[in-house]
Amino acid sequence: MTTQRHYSPIDRLLLQADMAMRTLLPFSGQPYRPSPAIVQPDAQMSETETRHVAGLMRINHTGEVCAQALYQGQALTAKLPQVRAAMEHAAEEEIDHLAWCEQRIRQLGSHPSVLNPLFYGLSFGIGAAAGLISDKVSLGFVAATEHQVCKHLDEHLEQLPAEDEKSRAILEQMRIDEEHHAESALDAGGFRFPAPVRFGMSLLAKVMTKSTYRI
């Protein structure tokens, strides 16, 4: 017979602090799955192409930082235990993406964005606020966010040099996972956000992508 552990508010705050450090500190996120890039050949790219791919992967890495913070914030304030558990499980899956992107960025001779702590804090606050409103809104926010991420991944896949199979393999697997997260959130009862809200979210996403491409 299995028992479910019940965490106190202090326990949850400590867990959130631990997850924040694992998300933001270099090389601290250990993936549960090996990177899809491992089995792909190295690419011969020009310096300009390498810088561009590094910028794209930096954007994707920051996107995963935001997703991690969003899930953690929602898990902290979710009202139903099953919703909280779903958020925590999704956050664990995002650790893979976080680690894969960082590994690829380092391979390309670059670094994650210095703005990650800022975006983590903002996303955590948004996630916690959504959870306070209702679990339905919280799940809907997950779905809308993941659909936005899928659009960015599609755009980045089109921009990758044809020979960069390592980055392509990572983004393709991330695309599959993010779509699954979005559909799972809707299936669990998530609210489908109207077009104006999704448009506002896309504007905020553009701020993140423009700023993290270079820094």
UniProtKB/Swiss-Prot annotation:
The Swiss-Prot or TrEMBL record lists the needed cofactor(s) as: Fe cation
Record-level GO cellular component terms: plasma membrane
Where Fe cation 2 binds, per the record, is at 94, 146, 178, 181
Please give the Gene Ontology molecular function terms for this protein. 3-demethoxyubiquinol 3-hydroxylase activity; metal ion binding
Record-level GO BP terms? ubiquinone biosynthetic process
Gene3D superfamilies, A to Z: 1.20.1260.10
What superkingdom does the record give? Bacteria
Q: Which SUPFAM superfamilies match?
A: Ferritin-like
Keywords from the named record:
Cell membrane, Iron, Membrane, Metal-binding, Monooxygenase, Oxidoreductase, Ubiquinone biosynthesis
Q: Which InterPro entries match?
A: COQ7_proteobact, Ferritin-like, Ferritin-like_SF, Ubq_synth_Coq7
Principal place of residence: membrane
Tell me the residue numbers annotated for binding Fe cation 1.
64, 94, 97, 178
How does the protein associate with the membrane?
Answer: Peripheral membrane protein
According to its UniProt entry, the function of this protein is described as:
Catalyzes the hydroxylation of 2-nonaprenyl-3-methyl-6-methoxy-1,4-benzoquinol during ubiquinone biosynthesis.
What name does the UniProt record give this protein?
3-demethoxyubiquinol 3-hydroxylase
